[in-house]
Design a protein with these regions (language model features):
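Alpha4 helix (beta4-alpha4-beta5 surface) of REC/receiver domains from two-component response regulators
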Residues: 90, 111-132, 141, 145
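Receiver (REC) domain active-site loop signature in two-component systems and cognate sites
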Residues: 83
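Short amphipathic alpha-helix used as the core "switch/output" element in two-component signaling
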Residues: 67, 89-100, 120-122
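Active-site beta3 strand of CheY-like receiver
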Residues: 72-78
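Helix N-cap/capping motif at the beta->alpha junctions
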Residues: 58-67, 88
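Two-component/phosphorelay signaling modules centered on CheY-like receiver
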Residues: 38-57
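Non-catalytic signal-transmission and effector/linker regions of two-component phosphorelay proteins
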Residues: 1-30, 135, 139-152
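Active-site residues of response regulator receiver
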Residues: 35, 80, 108
Length: 152
């Protein structure tokens, strides 16, 4: 499948494959992975870079993540729900005060439904607009599909 892009000047058309287009988009997408387990953030970062995402950063605690977020500009955040300093939902609330448009995918090891999570974490009530919840262990191909759905 080819995607036609019209150049800004003149009638020149550039044809690129869907995969080439995705790769170009991946290169520009800035992702921040937030999880208190360094092996998780390292693994996600490596896997996402292998899939063509070149601008991937990590934070191993919520406070550092908030500091990084204030200092940078991100297209997507991958946030673990259970972290020691501040849970992922509370972090999400703080981030939404700064940027209401950033996309977020929550990751969790919980094997319970979203409604039950909302009962455990009061801050989860502000996440009605979030559709990206991924359970650990994470299938990286599924994660990439979910990221693509969120950023496009």
């Amino acid at each position: 499948m080819l995607i036609q892009k019209q150049a800004a000047q003149g009638e020149q058309h550039i044809s690129v494959s869907k995969e080439e287009y995705k790769m170009q988009y991946h290169v520009r997408t800035r992702i921040l992975i937030i999880d208190d387990e360094p092996d998780i953030t390292f693994g996600f970062k490596k896997a996402l870079r292998d899939k063509g995402f070149e601008q991937v950063e990590t934070a191993n605690d919520s406070i550092l993540a908030l500091k990084n977020f204030k200092a940078g500009s991100y297209d997507l955040l991958i946030i673990d729900i259970v972290m020691p300093e501040m849970d992922g939902f509370s972090l999400y609330e703080e981030i939404r005060k700064i940027d209401k448009k950033v996309k977020v995918c929550f990751i969790t090891a919980f094997q319970i439904n979203y409604q039950a999570l909302r009962a455990v974490f009061p801050a989860a009530t502000s996440t009605d607009d979030i559709g990206c919840f991924i359970r650990k262990p994470v299938d990286m191909d599924d994660l990439v599909k979910r990221i693509n759905a969120e950023i496009q």
